[in-house]
Design a protein with these regions (language model features):
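Serine hydrolase/lipase
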Residues: 5, 11, 15, 65-68, ...
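Active-site-proximal beta-strand/loop segments in catalytic clefts of secreted hydrolases
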Residues: 73-76, 122-123, 140-143, 159
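Short amphipathic alpha-helical segments and helix-helix/interface helices
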Residues: 105, 129-130
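Gly/Ala-rich beta-loop-alpha elbow adjacent to hydrolase catalytic centers
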Residues: 120-125, 129
Length: 202
């Protein structure tokens, strides 16, 4: 059925059960990932952006109500990021995009504590999330082009998304959002599809 969600198992068996509950609603994930593509990312509801740490490609949000902190890594946007995609394809993290993301991640963990942070990323941002953090992670439609498994990761993907076809080999917890075939490949890759989870607690 269109929009149905499906939880997959993997070869790791019991290890998949060790993946922690993330403590974040899917609607919040959708909006924060979408906002990461804005030219000037801004606050979202109770999530206030930490301007002292945030940049254009990675943002740090603090929820003063819950105490939760979100670090969001943006996906591909522009020719420069396409070059980064190509570098990641060969397992090369020696680039300014990665260095800046790692710096922001380290500063956020030093300021707020790693246990209080959920790191999220869409597409290329998901790959970066895997590489800069070993804490709680939520990745969405992340292309898996090298070994980037993490037992603390919730990997969400949309069926028929051409950019994350081989992410089924990932460890951790998985959610697949069932989606019909679309002639526009970017439709199934879009963060809009997360809305089909109906504000599920992740």
């Amino acid at each position: 059925m269109f929009g149905k969600k499906n939880r997959q198992t993997n070869k790791m068996g019991a290890k998949q059960k060790e993946t922690p509950q993330m403590g974040m609603k899917s609607n919040d994930l959708e909006r924060i990932l979408a906002k990461s593509y804005e030219k000037t990312p801004s606050d979202y509801g109770d999530y206030k952006i930490d301007k002292s740490l945030s940049g254009q490609r990675a943002q740090v949000y603090k929820n003063d109500v819950t105490g939760k902190v979100i670090v969001a890594h943006r996906g591909t946007a522009g020719a420069h990021d396409m070059l980064t995609d190509a570098q990641f394809g060969f397992g090369n993290t020696n680039n300014k995009r990665f260095d800046r993301a790692k710096k922001i991640q380290n500063e956020a963990e030093a300021k707020y504590g790693k246990d209080n942070i959920i790191t999220v990323g869409h597409s290329l941002g998901g790959l970066i999330t895997n590489k800069v953090s070993d804490g709680k992670q939520i990745t969405y439609n992340k292309p898996t082009i090298f070994d980037s498994s993490n037992k603390n990761e919730l990997n969400i993907k949309t069926s028929n998304d051409p950019f994350s076809l081989n992410s089924n080999r990932e460890n951790g917890r998985k959610i697949v959002i069932e989606n019909g075939f679309n002639l526009n490949p970017f439709s199934n890759h879009s963060t809009d599809n997360i809305g089909k989870l109906n504000n599920e607690f992740l």
